[in-house]
Regions:
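Acidic-and-aromatic substrate-binding clefts and catalytic sites of carbohydrate-active enzymes
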Residues: 105-111
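Short beta-strand and adjacent tight-turn residues that come in two discontinuous sequence segments
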Residues: 102
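Glycan-binding loop/region signatures in secreted carbohydrate-active enzymes
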Residues: 22-91, 117-124
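Chitinase-like catalytic core of GlcNAc-active glycosidases
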Residues: 1-4, 76, 109
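Extracytoplasmic/secreted envelope proteins and their assembly/folding machinery
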Residues: 3-10, 82-89, 97, 112-115, ...
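Loop/turn elements at helix/coil->beta-strand transitions in domains of secreted/extracellular proteins
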Residues: 18-24, 95-99
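Catalytic-core region of carbohydrate-active enzymes that cleave or remodel glycosidic bonds
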Residues: 1-22
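Short Asp/Glu-rich motifs
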Residues: 32, 111-112
């Protein structure tokens, strides 16, 4: 899972002597499409507009603590939303990390839902 990868990277840095308070967690504002013939990504602002007749968004992966999309019942992509960002905010604070950053701003929706969620997650 992404948490295992993040934990491993953070541990490598802290084991090398970098203080956790100097590290930030980077999160994408897109979902990674990995099963398709041509893997790619889909921005959050496109995920929330997917046709609800074919796509189900906001399924929840309780192991990774992230939502994911299914297409006609099959896995399509995982991504972050307000809930998963809040969980990641709690996690980085528990590790004593500096904060969180994202890529990229233009992938957020017009209400800046994810940007606001990052702000809340880091500043609370």
């Amino acid at each position: 899972s992404a948490y295992v990868d993040c934990e491993r990277a953070i541990k490598a840095y802290t084991d090398a002597g970098v203080a956790a308070s100097k590290l930030v967690l980077g999160i994408p504002f897109y979902g990674r499409i990995s099963f398709d013939k041509s893997p790619g990504a889909i921005d959050y602002n496109k995920i929330i507009l997917l046709d609800k007749n074919d796509y189900k968004i906001d399924n929840w992966d309780s192991n990774a603590n992230v939502p994911y999309v299914t297409y006609k019942g099959s896995y399509y992509c995982g991504y972050d939303n307000e809930k998963s960002i809040a969980i990641k905010g709690d996690w980085i604070r528990s590790l004593g990390m500096k904060g969180m950053m994202y890529w990229d701003y233009n992938a957020d929706d017009n209400q800046h839902t994810l940007c606001k969620a990052v702000w809340q997650a880091v500043m609370k």
